Amino acid sequence: MTKEELIEFEQQIADLFNAKQIKSPIHLYHGNEDFIMEVFKEIDIENDWVCCTWRNHYQALLKGIPQNKILDSIVEGKSMVLNFYDHKFISSSIVGGIPSIAAGIAYANKLSNNNSRVWCWVGDMSAETGAFHEAYKFSLYNELPITFVIEDNKKSVCTPTSDAWKRETPYYLNQEYCGEIIRQQNLYYYQYSNDKYPHAGAGKRIQF
């Protein structure tokens, strides 16, 4: 799966949504392709779990799930809740809903000693929730095989995260961001800007 193929897939979903072929909300990626592909170089596609939020198309594609299978689920209205258990891929549309699930899977993996790692994506504002903090802290104290990948687009819907919390550097980072993926124990972090699509939808249809 190339960068161009990722972008093309999201454009296809945007076109279908604007043509009213997709009836449920969608959340599209753009601008993070290089970072997410770099992270996936470390993922064991067959053995590791990938856990996501409502914005999850790129992860599903990079996990090796067939495009037609992903497309069918999105057209059926499941864009925000793509779940393919046979591919060890799950997602949740609840803010702060996926970190504790991911930590639970990682805990089970540790008890089973099956060498499977969990990779859990969350946004920058979701990473400010108590649910994330508890899951992240639990993973550290129990030395769980999990990496939380925080994608920072600097906003929650239309609210700048730094304005909401009155700080530029998030509490969970031990260094300032310099343009590359920050790698800490059980946590990766990178920033990107999506100037192509709005928070939800594809820019032409009113949703909620």
Regions found by a protein language model. Give the residues of each.
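Conserved internal helical-beta-strand scaffold that buttresses enzyme catalytic cores
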Residues: 1-23, 72-86, 194-196, 200-208
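A short alpha-helix capping/helix-coil boundary motif
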Residues: 2-3, 17, 113-116, 148-151
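Thiamine diphosphate
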Residues: 142-208
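Intrinsically disordered, low-complexity boundary segments flanking structured domains
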Residues: 13-15, 38, 174-179
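Cofactor-binding active-site loop characterized by glycine-rich and histidine/acidic residues
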Residues: 14, 21-142, 163-167
